Structure formats: C-alpha cells, structure tokens
Amino acid sequence: MAAVSVYAPPVGGFSFDNCRRNAVLEADFAKRGYKLPKVRKTGTTIAGVVYKDGIVLGADTRATEGMVVADKNCSKIHFISPNIYCCGAGTAADTDMTTQLISSNLELHSLSTGRLPRVVTANRMLKQMLFRYQGYIGAALVLGGVDVTGPHLYSIYPHGSTDKLPYVTMGSGSLAAMAVFEDKFRPDMEEEEAKNLVSEAIAAGIFNDLGSGSNIDLCVISKNKLDFLRPYTVPNKKGTRLGRYRCEKGTTAVLTEKITPLEIEVLEETVQTMDTS
C-alpha cells in the first residue's frame, strides 16, 4: 500500500494569529467609519544607581498631556516607606495610586512585623499587583531602598516583570540615560559620584527626549540618612529679557480708523416689597 505524503509547512516559534485578528478588526472598523484606539504616549526619564553605601534615584519633572506640557515641576519620586522610594513613569494617575496603595500595605506589614520592610517585599507586592492587571495599569517603576541586607534596586514593568540591576533607567528618555550609565558607571562609587552620574543621565534624557524636561530631582537613600533633593539641578533655566519689548505709541502706522459709539439703553425698575406682617 502506497504511503500518502502530505506537505506540512514548517511551524515557527511565534504565533501571529492575534496580528491577523487585529488587521481584520481594523479593516472592519474602517469600513464602518471607526478607528481603533491608539496607545497613550507618555514621556519621562527616571533612573537609579547603586553606590557604595546606598541608592541614588533620579527623575525629571515634566508632565505631559499629548504634546502639551501639563506641569513643569511635578514630583515623580514617590514615598513607599522610610527606607524605600520609587520613581514612576507612564500614566501619572496609575503611578501615584499604585505607589500609595503599596505604601499603605507596607505600613500595615511594618506594624505587624515590628520592623522596617525589606525592598524585596515592596518589589513582590508591586509585581503581583501589576501582573494581576495584565499591563492595563500604565506604571513603569524604578524601586530602590536600603534594608538590613543592604541596598537594592529594581526595575518593574507594567506587565509585572522585574529586574534587579546595579543601574536602571526607564521612560521615553531611557535610551539616552542608559548610554550615560553604560559609559560611566563603575562599582562601589562614592555618594557624590553617584549623584553626578544620575544627574547626568537624567539630563541626557531631558535634552534628547521631548517628553522629558524641566528640573532634576534626586533621592539619596543610605543606612543612616535620607536626602530628598528637589530640585537638585535646573538644566533648563528660563532666560531673562535683555531689553524692553513694548513699542511706543505711534510706532506702527494706522491706515484707517473708525469709531463707533455705543448705544446704551437705560431701563428703570422698581421693586415693591411684600408686607409679611
């Protein structure tokens, strides 16, 4: 009996079924006169680095709404616990509410255990919460702090994945900031070296990304102290006017002039009070 051979095309490791589905949906929407919603574009540069005695976190201060600068001096470094802080990139409301929720949960955890929370505990709480919402919470975070086991620095993505690294940057200006880190980072830096490095990385994001701008905020966390430097530097200072820009009357020629008097109609009204006695 002859065997029948059927050609089966090779199957790769990736499935593009969802891409084909999205293309069909987009074509169907176009026929009906609709458009698929676009992904929200946000802009930020946040970064962190581990130095010899602790952590340095940094962020810019520009908040955008589309292509409009909504706030020139917003704070993107959020309080988690006395020894842990978190930088937020993405949707501002999501980063604010997410860090506030985890901060309150860590406070309850601290009251229950009677000691300061560990950084890995905050990392676990954040990643579990973000993974539960499958990326619909637009919060990209840089978590840093110092506990009994030493300094720790994590990057947390909106879908819940995390990395523990000696230097981290996230946001739309992260490519420029990462270039500075990869060029100048070295282990066991002193505090001033780490502050200057993070400041330079944030400045690279500010000058090379339209979504980042204004000032540079830093947060230095060590075992014995916490310094919140706001602002640390102001790379985009507003220029001063060099002269008087108001023209004198008569500088510009007037070709025609027409004066229209206003017609005012005066109405008189009398009000009679009602006797309620």
Swiss-Prot record:
Expressed at a low level in colonic mucosa. Up-regulated in colorectal cancer tissues. The keyword Nucleus applies. It is found in: Cytoplasm; Nucleus. One of its GO terms (cellular component) is cilium. Keywords: Cytoplasm, Host-virus interaction, Hydrolase, Nucleus, Protease, Proteasome, Threonine protease, Zymogen. It catalyses: Cleavage of peptide bonds with very broad specificity. Residues 1-43 form a propeptide. It is an enzyme of class 3 (hydrolase). Its EC number is 3.4.25.1. One of its GO terms (biological process) is proteasome-mediated ubiquitin-dependent protein catabolic process. Pfam families: Pr_beta_C (PF12465), Proteasome (PF00227). The 26S proteasome consists of a 20S proteasome core and two 19S regulatory subunits. The 20S proteasome core is a barrel-shaped complex made of 28 subunits that are arranged in four stacked rings. The two outer rings are each formed by seven alpha subunits, and the two inner rings are formed by seven beta subunits. The proteolytic activity is exerted by three beta-subunits PSMB5, PSMB6 and PSMB7. (Microbial infection) Interacts with HIV-1 Tat protein. Belongs to the peptidase T1B family. This is Proteasome subunit beta type-7. The gene is PSMB7.
